[in-house]
Amino acid sequence: MDPSRSRSGGSGEESSFQENERRWQQERLHREEAYYQFINELSDEDYRLMRDHNLLGTPGEITSEELQQRLERAKEQLASQPGSDSAASDGDSESLRAHSDEDSLLRWLNTFRRTGNVTRSGQNGNQSWRAVSRTNPNSGEFGFSLEIHINPDNRGSEMHGEDSTDIPLSGVNREHRQQRPSSPVARRTRSQTSMSSSGPRGRRGARRQGSVQGSFATLGRLRNGIGVALGVPRVSAPRTNVINSHTNQSDGSTLRQGGRQRFGAAHIWENGARSNVTVRNTNQRLEPIRLRPAFSSRSRSPIQRQNGTVHHNSQRQGRPVQQTGRNRSVRHRGVTRVFLEQGREHRGTDYTPLSNSRLVSRITVEEGESSRSSAATQRHPAITLDLQVRRIRPGETRDRDSIANRTRSRAGLAESTVESTSGGFHRTISHLERSGVRTYVSTITVPLRRISENDVVEPSSVALRSILRQIMTGFGELSSLMEVEPASENQSNGQRLPEVYLELSNGDAADDSGQHGRASSQASQAQDGAEMLAVREPAPPQARPSGSRSRRQLGRADSVVEAGTLPILRLAHFFLLNEGDDDPIRGLTKEQIDNLSTRSYEQDGVDSELGKVCSVCISDYVAGNKLRQLPCLHEFHIHCIDRWLSENCTCPVCRRPVLEFGATSSG
């Protein structure tokens, strides 16, 4: 009796399960049909709007009503973009608001070499930009500067009424600073030249002095960018940073540090004339982005030079200008470099000891170009991401002006470097230790190629994602090193970086990602202080372990790209990864995809004789379906193939490159 009851009960449950399964499949088929019907009825503009903002979803998993709501919401955001501060969809809203102004900025950047001396400006919500171009057609030298001011509180006159401590400058600097006592903008662009070093290790630079360089600086707070996604803490309101500035040590002038030091200054030399740009730093963190076209000599100085001052000369004027707090001369041979710089103190500057470490970033793009020959050979440029984090032992009391302390710092100098190469990215981690201060440096070199002016790179392109993945990995490694440092100190005060880094690299993936997550959380807590670091180059490699990557950090990189909050995205429109690297993910841009032909599927005629199944979703075509045809004549649902082509550049069926058939004109 009992066995029969159990058998009947089991059969009843099985039939109920099968019925539910059939009902679920039927509902999914209905949702798929409604999905395709919705896509078929969309105009080209509405389809691109939803596709570009990742609103299409997956067939069968989203209803047509939800799709319609997404479309209406996107249109509302687009219509209200001038003053929209809605938080309903921060990433999409921000992207829509910045689109028109970003396009105008990019158009100007694409043509600045032909425009001569031109100034352009624009406003977009709480962001304003001002760009100045200076071109010398005869010599081929050019320079430009760009200011992007971000004021989250919309306080245009934030600079007024602030206390500041002056930095001793030359007479020209003082005159220029007095001419601009108050500015309606919260931050200023720092423009300067890269001058060849005349120090002991930079004598080779004297042969190529005076390369005209335009600085391209973007100053702004990254509330929604690096400050959140990278786990970088925000600067507290009472604390400010000081941008490294040029001073004249021959007059005995030094940086004077007050309780709230806000002024910096730099020079730009062009055709023998020097102009100055004042840098004001408010209580918001800075992220300068500097673009310097130039050609200068090579400096082989190590990652930390013991003498704290480098003398520079100008070819035209010959005036000695000394740069405080910078420990190397920057070199670039037709290359493009990006430096993410972490905070550290200027030498000879009063400094308040910190009890914790702190991550602060600065991105610098430098584009090298030979000014001696217009027919110079094109070289594949490279990006260098230089991330640094420093830690001061708690309770350490130091007098920055003490000669004995500086002697101890030099005597306690210790360096070690670990190098690895993966996926076309050359990566180096260096460890620098002085008495009381420990610094970790993560340097990443990314191969790039300059694309033509007609080409357009999407902010969400694979190149940017790859670059930001490397940034994320670098921050994760530095944070992990800072986290394991106390434990390593307890075991051995003399432990070198290779031992710590090898321990991190050889750990399990789960442990690695856990370390990154905990370290990012630690770093995002209140850790103040430290000035902006000077530009530096990686030290010579000594070892080559293979470093593991944090998946959690990689995921965050994608979210940063999609949000479009990093100012580097504007510059990265001009770059793609080098064709020779081995990055496995390559897709087409949205413009290239849109240039492929489309049509509607018809049941009659030729279509009845051709294939009726989309090879991507394995679904039958229905009359009215929008199809996109590749140059190889294979066809697919438009939404299926667009998603495929965003990550791949080949046909899903024949695997032939899509752009090989003459579609390269799509740019």
Curated annotation (Swiss-Prot):
Main subcellular location of this protein, as a coarse class: nucleus
Name of the protein this chain belongs to: E3 ubiquitin-protein ligase RNF6
Tissue distribution: Widely expressed with higher expression in the testis in both germ cells and Sertoli cells.
Region (Disordered): 1-25, 75-100, 116-216, 295-355, 396-419, 507-532, 537-556
UniProt family annotation: Belongs to the RNF12 family.
General function of this protein: E3 ubiquitin-protein ligase mediating 'Lys-48'-linked polyubiquitination of LIMK1 and its subsequent targeting to the proteasome for degradation. Negatively regulates axonal outgrowth through regulation of the LIMK1 turnover. Mediates 'Lys-6' and 'Lys-27'-linked polyubiquitination of AR/androgen receptor thereby modulating its transcriptional activity. May also bind DNA and function as a transcriptional regulator. Mediates polyubiquitination of QKI in macrophages, leading to its degradation.
InterPro entries the record matches: RING_finger_E3_ligase, Znf_RING, Znf_RING/FYVE/PHD
Catalytic reaction(s) noted: S-ubiquitinyl-[E2 ubiquitin-conjugating enzyme]-L-cysteine + [acceptor protein]-L-lysine = [E2 ubiquitin-conjugating enzyme]-L-cysteine + N(6)-ubiquitinyl-[acceptor protein]-L-lysine
Annotated compartments: Nucleus; Cytoplasm; Cell projection, Axon; Nucleus, PML body
Organism of provenance: Mus musculus (Mouse)
Protein's pathway: Protein modification; protein ubiquitination
Residues the record lists as Phosphoserine modifications: S559
Alphabetized UniProt keyword annotations: Cell projection, Cytoplasm, Metal-binding, Nucleus, Phosphoprotein, Transferase, Ubl conjugation pathway, Zinc, Zinc-finger
Pfam families, per database record: zf-RING_2
Coiled-coil stretches noted in the UniProt entry, renumbered to this chain: none
Segments of skewed composition (Low complexity): 79-90, 191-200, 516-530
GO BP annotations, alphabetical order: axon extension; negative regulation of axon extension; positive regulation of DNA-templated transcription; protein K27-linked ubiquitination; protein K48-linked ubiquitination; protein K6-linked ubiquitination; regulation of androgen receptor signaling pathway; regulation of DNA-templated transcription
Zinc fingers, RING-type class: 614-655
